[in-house]
Amino acid sequence: MGSRNTTVGVPGYDPVYDDLCATPEAVSLCDDIEAFLYNVLCVEMPKAETPKQRVEALRAKLNRPVRVAGMVKNQGEPGGGPFIIAEKDGSTSLQVLESVQINMSDDHARNALASATHFNPVDIVCCLHDYKGESFDLLKYVDEDAGFISSKSYQGRELKALELPGLWNGAMSNWNTLFVEVPLATFNPVKVVLDLLRPAHQN
């Protein structure tokens, strides 16, 4: 008891909470959560310095909006697709990236795009409420640095455009993500006028 009293007043220290985070039961539960994140969501967590930091990091990682993105097999259509990326905090996450977001001068990144088996999301199902049933503030889960420069044309002129974070590659960047395969028949894009001649657009 004497040693605990010496730490009273230290910012962020709660002897009861800190001790609970270090119990064998808490450690085992954290192990299970990390295994779930890794095996299901492809999230690899950075090593925490203390049991308390580990608990808080896992809670923050779990308690966020969820998107389930339906992907179709890659048929050579232009655009991006599903990737596992490294985050600034040392963790990994599933993200939908456009091809212009990928560094084509990096052999590994270029090969990853070329060998991608699936294509951008066709359907997205979202969970917008937390475990208490309260709505998430979605603005807290936007990556403001996810903008990119794209090539556009206007009245016959080639332009460079700085695009703000898109719906699924920036605005949902800090959501938890699941990728599922959906039938190719659900994907009927119109990227050029000739796409309207496809059978899916003839009815």
Task: Describe the predicted segments one by one.
Residues 1-18, 23-203:
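OB-fold and OB-like single-stranded nucleic-acid-recognition modules
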